[in-house]
């Protein structure tokens, strides 16, 4: 969330890239486009075509839920609008459970969120998944095509978890945290719990983590600027 705040907030008490340094990124989560189970679409192109048809015919526009302005779910929704050249309406919620409840009931039709938060509902058939955000298919949803496979390679991104430290932290301490965390995430119990939650484990070192975060920053900055997303 903090890298996104660096993009969407005009004033912050710190600078994410100048004042913090990554020690490790230890897991990633695929983002998934999910829709209400009764929406007559099964893949991304059908969703985009439905949105265009309703806009053209003056029908009720589709809505997408987010957990608030400037969040990844909001930026991903605007990414979908820009890439698909559509205007699905943003409906911000104060909490993820509230957004998910309204998606299931049909008050909103679309949500883009981490698989780790949606996995049980997808498995139970309460919502319908139509695309994943990673460059390769997710091992937990191997039959679900990626954005790139469906013609939208610019929508490739992931969610991640990691540890950051004060930028003035001595390098040997940063490396120690990296190595200790890498050991913990290789333990069978940790792996099992991560799999149950839909997370994929990884161990990006400080240099790799910063490169990934800078690439995300550049990609999301373009979307935020075009969509005029500001959180103040």
Q: Which residues make up each language-model segment?
A:
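Short helices/loops that flank or line small-molecule/ion binding pockets
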Residues: 78-83, 97-107, 111, 116-124, ...
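Paired acidic/hydrophobic, glycine-rich loop segments that form the ligand-binding mouth/hinge
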Residues: 109-113, 128-131, 220-222
């Amino acid at each position: 969330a903090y890298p996104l705040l660096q993009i969407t907030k005009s004033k912050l008490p710190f600078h994410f890239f100048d004042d913090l340094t990554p020690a490790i990124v230890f897991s990633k989560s695929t983002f998934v486009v999910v829709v209400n189970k009764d929406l007559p679409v099964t893949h991304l192109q059908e969703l985009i075509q439905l949105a265009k048809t309703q806009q053209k015919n003056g029908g009720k526009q589709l809505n997408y839920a987010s957990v608030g302005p400037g969040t990844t779910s909001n930026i991903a929704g605007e990414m979908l609008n820009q890439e698909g050249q559509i205007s699905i309406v943003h409906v911000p919620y104060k909490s993820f459970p509230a957004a998910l409840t309204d998606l299931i009931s049909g008050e909103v039709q679309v949500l883009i969120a981490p698989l780790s938060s949606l996995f049980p509902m997808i498995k139970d058939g309460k919502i319908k998944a139509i695309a994943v955000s990673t460059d390769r298919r997710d091992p937990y949803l191997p039959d679900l095509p990626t954005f790139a496979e469906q013609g939208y390679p610019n929508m490739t991104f992931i969610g991640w978890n990691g540890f950051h430290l004060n930028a003035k932290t001595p390098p040997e301490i940063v490396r120690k945290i990296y190595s200790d965390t890498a050991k913990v995430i290789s333990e069978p119990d940790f792996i099992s719990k991560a799999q149950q939650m839909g997370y994929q484990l990884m161990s990006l070192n400080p240099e790799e983590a910063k490169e990934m975060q800078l690439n995300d920053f550049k990609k999301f900055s373009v979307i935020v600027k075009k969509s005029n997303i500001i959180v103040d």
